[in-house]
Structure formats: C-alpha cells, structure tokens
C-alpha cells in the first residue's frame, strides 16, 4: 500500500467497521452533523438575532432604554408602520440570496399626495372619468437623496366600498399633458375598505433622476370598445370634501401616498467595503426524530428574550429556525471519498453532509426610537418561512 494510503487508513477504519456490521445495506443516511441540544440551539438563535438586528441598523449597542417616550405612537408613524407590515404580509418570501445592498435595514418613508384642493391641480388637463394624484418631488428627494438608494416604491390607495366590479388603469404623468400607461387592476365588489398597491419603483427612480417639481399618476376606468359608460365607480379615500373636523384629518392622512423603502445614505457608504455576510445557524447541523428537514417555530419576545424596550412595534415576532435530518449517500467506491475524508480532517467542526438551512425568508418591519424620534424601518431576511437541505 502506498504511503498516502497508509495515512488515510485510520480515517477509513470506522467506516469499514460500520459496513461490516451492517452487510447488505448501502451507506445511506450517514451524517457527520453533531447532535445539538434543543435549548442550546434556541439560545444560540436568540443571540444571533440580537446581533443581526443591531448590525442591520448599524448600531454598536442598543439605544438607551430611558430615551423611549412613554406615549402612544404618532398617528402618522403608526399608519406608516401598518402600511409596511401589510405590504410584507401580502408578499411571498424571496428564496434567492439577497444582494449585498439588501443586507442592511431599509428606511421606510411615506410621502402623501398633494391635497386635491391645491391650486397645482388646476394646471392638469383633467378628465371627468379619472382621479389625479400629484406629488412634490422635493419631498421624494428629501426622503431618497440618490436614485440608486431606492429599493422599492409603491403607490397605495385606500379604496372604499364598491358596489360593482370595475376594471381600472393606472397612468404616469408624462410631458405636455400626456399620460403613459403603467398597469391595470380588476376590482371586485366589496362592502369593506381595501388598500390597493401598485409597484412604481421604476417611475419614482425616473422622477428622482430628472423629474420636474411636480409629478403624478392618473387612475381611470378601463374604456372598452363595446362599452358606452366608462365612469370611474371606485371611491378612493382623500377625494371627498364633505368631511369636517377630526374625521377630515383622518380622511386626509389616508389619502393616496407613496411608500418608499431606501438604504439610508450613511449606510450606503458601507456597501462597497468588504465584509463577511452574517448567516444564522451556519456553524451547526441538526438531527432529530423528525422525518424531514423542516421549520421549527421560535417566537422572540423583545422584552423577555432580549431585554429590549426600545423597539416599540412589534412586541415580538416568529423568527423560527430550521431543523431535521438530511440523508445522503457516501460509499467507499466513489472518487470523492478521499476528498471528503481530508475535508473532515482539516475541518473537524464542519460537516461534509448536507444540512437543514433556511430557504425562504421574509423581512420584519419595526418601529424604534432614536432619542425621542420614532423611526420605521424594514429588516431584511428576519423570518424563516421554509427550509432546505444544502
């Protein structure tokens, strides 16, 4: 036997004994993953989440607990948080790895439509079958200084009761009173209000790059060739002038707005620096009596588990983690057996076998205080929704 074979012999003896003791069975389901105590796994996961949240917010330590004002959240901040939470709830998780720019938390900003009583609407050539929503681009640029920082932009409208089904179309304000078609939506009859959302990320990026002082959208009824009536039947919150007092204030707050998610400028400066991606549970493989790799529920209470009072909303969330066996086949007659043996020799704490890891993750919107100022941000990849063997 050559010298290299003698050096590998001690590594192969345990596997040979296993094959001799179990004749007639393939070497399937073998794993070098370590058995981890469940409570230890949960504690490690909680500590990883603690570091992940601070890292995504670019904080070296939690803000002072005494800085949190003991008062209810302002209505505008709460409305912004609820809009962000509802949007996340309506989206499916992205299983692909996030780009480097998506690692850090996104600052969420709400830019309200200019009230329809403003004189700037007089400059727009109107149609009786449409509603018009104008925005000051100066407010957009204040929220997002550079177009490249914008991650997503949505136009959100609160649709009130609708008696009959209607097909509507959204247009972008173009040059010389012309309008460019963007998308359409078929609205079903409903007795309850409903938020409508349109992805306008590309349009807002254009406005940030070379837009005018005022830009906007038009919502119109779909005009089919065989229909004589193209009246817009949809009642959108913010376009009725019959309300007074506090009701008018609430009505105005829920008028159409742009929901912007962008990387803050100070965080963007770190995007080009080299860093090692943080990943939860990469140092551990799990095995249990479960039949398959699966999602295990883990609820994080910010006060109880992390000792934090500075995150105002939510009070906690289901972070979850992945757990379960990942069977694989490793036989002695494969050309990779020596490579795997050497890998284990040089990486005794690692596993050459596939392990149960997150596949689909979802973001987490939060409201937290910086001094006495509340902020709404979205933390990417915080909730495990599905797992895979990798």
Curated annotation (Swiss-Prot):
Glycans are attached at residues 82, 136, 176. Residues 30-74 are annotated as: Straightjacket domain. Residues 75-271 are annotated as: Arm domain. Disulfide bonds join 285-294, 293-356, 322-387, 326-389. The record marks 278-279 as: Cleavage. This is Transforming growth factor beta-1 proprotein. The gene is TGFB1. Residues 1-29 form the signal peptide. One of its GO terms (molecular function) is type II transforming growth factor beta receptor binding.
């Amino acid at each position: 036997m050559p010298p290299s074979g003698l050096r590998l012999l001690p590594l192969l003896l345990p596997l040979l004994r296993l094959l001799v003791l179990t004749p007639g069975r393939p070497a399937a389901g073998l794993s070098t993953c370590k058995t981890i105590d469940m409570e230890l796994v949960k504690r490690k996961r909680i500590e990883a989440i603690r570091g992940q949240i601070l890292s995504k917010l670019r904080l070296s330590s939690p803000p002072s607990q005494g800085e949190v004002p003991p008062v209810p959240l302002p209505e505008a901040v709460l409305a912004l948080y609820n809009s962000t939470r509802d949007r996340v709830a309506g989206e499916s998780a992205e299983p692909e790895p996030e780009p480097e720019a998506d690692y850090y938390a996104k600052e969420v900003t709400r830019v309200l439509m200019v009230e329809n009583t403003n004189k700037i609407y007089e400059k727009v050539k109107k149609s009786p079958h449409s509603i018009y929503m104008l925005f000051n681009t100066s407010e957009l640029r204040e929220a997002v200084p550079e177009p490249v920082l914008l991650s997503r932009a949505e136009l959100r409208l609160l649709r009130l009761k609708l008696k009959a089904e209607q097909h509507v179309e959204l247009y972008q304000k173009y040059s010389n009173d012309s309008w460019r078609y963007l998308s359409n939506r078929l609205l079903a009859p409903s007795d309850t209000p409903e938020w409508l959302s349109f992805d306008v990320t590309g349009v807002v990026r254009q406005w940030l790059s070379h837009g005018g002082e005022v830009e906007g959208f038009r919502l119109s009824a779909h005009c089919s060739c065989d229909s004589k009536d193209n009246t817009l039947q949809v009642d959108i919150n913010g376009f009725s002038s019959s309300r007074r007092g506090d009701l008018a204030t609430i009505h105005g707050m829920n008028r159409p707005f742009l929901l912007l998610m962008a990387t803050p400028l100070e965080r963007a400066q770190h995007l080009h620096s080299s860093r090692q991606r943080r990943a939860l549970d990469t140092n551990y493989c799990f095995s249990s009596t479960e039949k398959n790799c699966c999602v295990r529920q883990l609820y994080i209470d910010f006060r109880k588990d992390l000792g934090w009072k500075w995150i105002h909303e939510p009070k906690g969330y289901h972070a979850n983690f992945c757990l379960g066996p990942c069977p694989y086949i490793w036989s002695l007659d494969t050309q990779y057996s020596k490579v795997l043996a050497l890998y284990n020799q040089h990486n005794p704490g690692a596993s050459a076998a596939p392990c149960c890891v997150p596949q689909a993750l979802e973001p987490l919107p939060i409201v937290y205080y910086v001094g006495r100022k509340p902020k709404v941000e979205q933390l990417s990849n915080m909730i495990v929704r599905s797992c895979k063997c990798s």
